[in-house]
Amino acid sequence: MANIVFIDNFDSFTYNLVDQFRSLGHSVKIYRNHIPAETIEQAINELENPVVLLSPGPGAPSEAGSMPELIQRMKGKVPMIGICLGHQAIVEAYGGTVAGAGEIIHGKVSMMEHQDHAIYQNLPSPLAIARYHSLVATKVPDSLTITAEVDNLVMSVVHEQDKVCGFQFHPESIMTTYGATLLGNAIEWALEKNNA
Protein backbone atom coordinates (compact mmCIF):
# COMPACT_ATOMS: atom_id res chain seq x y z
CA MET A 1 0.00 0.00 0.00
CA ALA A 2 1.17 3.50 -0.82
CA ASN A 3 0.74 6.57 1.35
CA ILE A 4 -0.27 9.06 -1.32
CA VAL A 5 0.43 12.72 -0.64
CA PHE A 6 -2.03 14.37 -3.00
CA ILE A 7 -1.19 17.91 -4.11
CA ASP A 8 -4.53 19.45 -5.05
CA ASN A 9 -4.23 22.18 -7.67
CA PHE A 10 -7.87 23.20 -7.16
CA ASP A 11 -9.22 20.98 -9.92
CA SER A 12 -12.68 19.50 -10.44
CA PHE A 13 -11.10 16.09 -11.12
CA THR A 14 -9.46 15.91 -7.68
CA TYR A 15 -12.05 13.77 -5.95
CA ASN A 16 -12.41 11.34 -8.87
CA LEU A 17 -8.68 10.69 -8.50
CA VAL A 18 -8.77 10.45 -4.71
CA ASP A 19 -11.66 7.96 -4.92
CA GLN A 20 -9.81 5.83 -7.48
CA PHE A 21 -6.68 5.62 -5.34
CA ARG A 22 -8.68 4.82 -2.20
CA SER A 23 -10.64 2.11 -4.04
CA LEU A 24 -7.26 0.61 -5.06
CA GLY A 25 -6.49 0.31 -1.33
CA HIS A 26 -4.11 3.25 -0.89
CA SER A 27 -4.14 5.88 1.83
CA VAL A 28 -4.57 9.44 0.51
CA LYS A 29 -3.82 12.70 2.31
CA ILE A 30 -4.73 15.91 0.47
CA TYR A 31 -2.73 19.15 0.57
CA ARG A 32 -3.92 22.13 -1.45
CA ASN A 33 -1.16 23.95 -3.32
CA HIS A 34 -1.33 27.08 -1.14
CA ILE A 35 0.29 25.09 1.68
CA PRO A 36 4.07 25.77 1.82
CA ALA A 37 6.30 23.15 0.15
CA GLU A 38 8.35 22.86 3.34
CA THR A 39 5.26 21.84 5.36
CA ILE A 40 4.31 19.20 2.80
CA GLU A 41 7.91 17.93 2.65
CA GLN A 42 7.93 17.42 6.43
CA ALA A 43 4.69 15.43 6.21
CA ILE A 44 6.11 13.27 3.39
CA ASN A 45 9.26 12.52 5.38
CA GLU A 46 7.18 11.00 8.19
CA LEU A 47 5.46 8.46 5.92
CA GLU A 48 6.32 4.92 4.87
CA ASN A 49 6.02 4.23 1.13
CA PRO A 50 5.10 7.80 0.20
CA VAL A 51 4.12 8.66 -3.37
CA VAL A 52 3.46 12.29 -4.29
CA LEU A 53 0.54 12.77 -6.67
CA LEU A 54 0.54 16.09 -8.54
CA SER A 55 -3.03 16.76 -9.59
CA PRO A 56 -4.53 18.39 -12.67
CA GLY A 57 -5.54 22.04 -12.38
CA PRO A 58 -6.06 25.29 -14.26
CA GLY A 59 -3.36 27.55 -15.70
CA ALA A 60 0.35 26.92 -16.13
CA PRO A 61 2.68 25.01 -13.76
CA SER A 62 4.36 28.23 -12.63
CA GLU A 63 0.98 29.46 -11.31
CA ALA A 64 0.34 26.30 -9.26
CA GLY A 65 1.29 27.59 -5.81
CA SER A 66 3.92 25.53 -3.99
CA MET A 67 3.89 22.60 -6.45
CA PRO A 68 6.96 23.61 -8.55
CA GLU A 69 9.05 24.14 -5.39
CA LEU A 70 7.86 20.85 -3.91
CA ILE A 71 8.95 18.95 -7.05
CA GLN A 72 12.42 20.52 -6.83
CA ARG A 73 12.68 19.58 -3.16
CA MET A 74 11.47 15.99 -3.59
CA LYS A 75 12.68 14.78 -7.02
CA GLY A 76 15.06 11.87 -6.65
CA LYS A 77 13.97 11.38 -3.03
CA VAL A 78 10.33 10.31 -3.33
CA PRO A 79 8.36 8.81 -6.24
CA MET A 80 6.02 11.27 -7.98
CA ILE A 81 3.14 10.89 -10.41
CA GLY A 82 1.86 13.96 -12.26
CA ILE A 83 -1.41 14.25 -14.14
CA CYS A 84 -2.07 16.96 -16.74
CA LEU A 85 -0.82 20.13 -14.96
CA GLY A 86 1.24 17.89 -12.66
CA HIS A 87 2.83 16.21 -15.69
CA GLN A 88 3.66 19.61 -17.21
CA ALA A 89 5.22 20.72 -13.92
CA ILE A 90 7.44 17.61 -13.93
CA VAL A 91 8.63 18.37 -17.48
CA GLU A 92 9.50 21.96 -16.46
CA ALA A 93 11.19 20.83 -13.23
CA TYR A 94 13.58 18.64 -15.23
CA GLY A 95 14.41 21.47 -17.65
CA GLY A 96 11.83 20.95 -20.39
CA THR A 97 9.42 23.43 -21.96
CA VAL A 98 5.63 23.60 -21.85
CA ALA A 99 3.71 25.73 -24.36
CA GLY A 100 0.38 26.01 -26.18
CA ALA A 101 -0.82 22.78 -27.80
CA GLY A 102 -2.15 24.66 -30.82
CA GLU A 103 -5.74 23.95 -29.83
CA ILE A 104 -7.75 23.67 -26.63
CA ILE A 105 -8.66 20.04 -26.02
CA HIS A 106 -11.66 19.60 -23.74
CA GLY A 107 -13.03 16.14 -23.18
CA LYS A 108 -11.60 14.58 -26.32
CA VAL A 109 -10.95 10.86 -26.61
CA SER A 110 -7.73 10.07 -28.48
CA MET A 111 -6.13 6.76 -29.39
CA MET A 112 -2.66 6.79 -27.83
CA GLU A 113 0.28 4.61 -28.85
CA HIS A 114 2.51 3.70 -25.90
CA GLN A 115 5.97 2.16 -25.56
CA ASP A 116 4.92 -0.82 -23.45
CA HIS A 117 6.64 0.59 -20.37
CA ALA A 118 5.90 -1.20 -17.06
CA ILE A 119 3.26 1.46 -16.31
CA TYR A 120 1.32 0.32 -19.39
CA GLN A 121 1.75 -3.38 -18.65
CA ASN A 122 -1.10 -5.52 -20.04
CA LEU A 123 -2.78 -2.48 -21.61
CA PRO A 124 -3.60 -2.32 -25.33
CA SER A 125 -1.77 0.04 -27.67
CA PRO A 126 -3.37 2.18 -28.94
CA LEU A 127 -5.23 2.96 -25.73
CA ALA A 128 -8.30 5.24 -25.56
CA ILE A 129 -7.49 8.24 -23.34
CA ALA A 130 -9.34 11.38 -22.22
CA ARG A 131 -7.68 14.73 -22.89
CA TYR A 132 -8.45 18.12 -21.36
CA HIS A 133 -5.61 20.55 -22.00
CA SER A 134 -4.42 23.64 -23.85
CA LEU A 135 -0.72 23.26 -22.92
CA VAL A 136 1.66 20.46 -23.85
CA ALA A 137 5.33 19.57 -23.35
CA THR A 138 7.05 21.00 -26.43
CA LYS A 139 10.60 20.15 -25.37
CA VAL A 140 11.33 17.13 -23.19
CA PRO A 141 14.77 17.01 -21.53
CA ASP A 142 17.05 14.00 -22.11
CA SER A 143 16.59 12.90 -18.50
CA LEU A 144 12.93 12.09 -19.18
CA THR A 145 11.84 9.26 -21.48
CA ILE A 146 8.73 9.76 -23.61
CA THR A 147 6.52 6.69 -23.12
CA ALA A 148 3.43 7.66 -25.15
CA GLU A 149 2.34 10.12 -27.83
CA VAL A 150 -0.73 11.21 -29.81
CA ASP A 151 -0.19 13.04 -33.13
CA ASN A 152 3.45 13.71 -32.13
CA LEU A 153 2.30 15.36 -28.89
CA VAL A 154 3.88 14.01 -25.68
CA MET A 155 1.30 12.15 -23.59
CA SER A 156 3.49 10.57 -20.92
CA VAL A 157 7.05 10.64 -19.59
CA VAL A 158 9.10 8.78 -16.99
CA HIS A 159 12.33 9.31 -15.09
CA GLU A 160 13.31 5.73 -14.33
CA GLN A 161 15.94 6.47 -11.68
CA ASP A 162 13.90 9.05 -9.75
CA LYS A 163 10.65 7.06 -10.08
CA VAL A 164 8.81 10.03 -11.52
CA CYS A 165 6.14 9.75 -14.20
CA GLY A 166 3.72 12.14 -15.84
CA PHE A 167 0.51 11.72 -17.80
CA GLN A 168 -0.77 14.56 -20.00
CA PHE A 169 -4.16 12.83 -20.18
CA HIS A 170 -6.65 11.95 -17.42
CA PRO A 171 -6.49 8.27 -16.33
CA GLU A 172 -9.27 8.96 -13.81
CA SER A 173 -11.77 10.00 -16.52
CA ILE A 174 -14.45 7.50 -17.46
CA MET A 175 -13.39 8.09 -21.08
CA THR A 176 -9.94 6.58 -20.46
CA THR A 177 -10.24 2.82 -20.84
CA TYR A 178 -8.29 0.84 -18.23
CA GLY A 179 -7.64 4.05 -16.26
CA ALA A 180 -7.78 2.34 -12.86
CA THR A 181 -5.36 -0.36 -14.07
CA LEU A 182 -3.00 2.33 -15.33
CA LEU A 183 -3.05 4.20 -12.00
CA GLY A 184 -2.52 0.93 -10.13
CA ASN A 185 0.43 0.06 -12.39
CA ALA A 186 1.91 3.54 -11.88
CA ILE A 187 1.81 3.22 -8.08
CA GLU A 188 3.28 -0.29 -8.23
CA TRP A 189 6.10 0.94 -10.48
CA ALA A 190 6.70 3.98 -8.26
CA LEU A 191 7.12 1.82 -5.15
CA GLU A 192 9.28 -0.87 -6.76
CA LYS A 193 12.73 0.68 -6.49
CA ASN A 194 11.69 2.38 -3.29
CA ASN A 195 11.96 -0.97 -1.54
CA ALA A 196 15.05 -2.16 -3.42
Curated annotation (Swiss-Prot):
Pathway: Amino-acid biosynthesis; L-tryptophan biosynthesis; L-tryptophan from chorismate: step 1/5. The active site is at residues 84, 170, 172. Keywords: Amino-acid biosynthesis, Aromatic amino acid biosynthesis, Glutamine amidotransferase, Lyase, Tryptophan biosynthesis. GO terms for cellular component: cytosol. InterPro entries: Anth_synth/Amidotransfase, Class_I_gatase-like, GATASE, TrpG/PapA_dom. GO terms for biological process: L-tryptophan biosynthetic process; phenazine biosynthetic process. It is an enzyme of class 4 (lyase). GO terms for molecular function: anthranilate phosphoribosyltransferase activity; anthranilate synthase activity. Pfam families: GATase. Coiled coil: none annotated. Heterotetramer consisting of two non-identical subunits: a beta subunit (TrpG) and a large alpha subunit (TrpE). PANTHER family: BIFUNCTIONAL PROTEIN TRPGD (PTHR43418:SF2), MULTIFUNCTIONAL TRYPTOPHAN BIOSYNTHESIS PROTEIN-RELATED (PTHR43418). This is Anthranilate synthase component 2. It comes from Vibrio parahaemolyticus serotype O3:K6 (strain RIMD 2210633). The lineage of its organism: Bacteria, Pseudomonadati, Pseudomonadota, Gammaproteobacteria, Vibrionales. The gene is trpG.
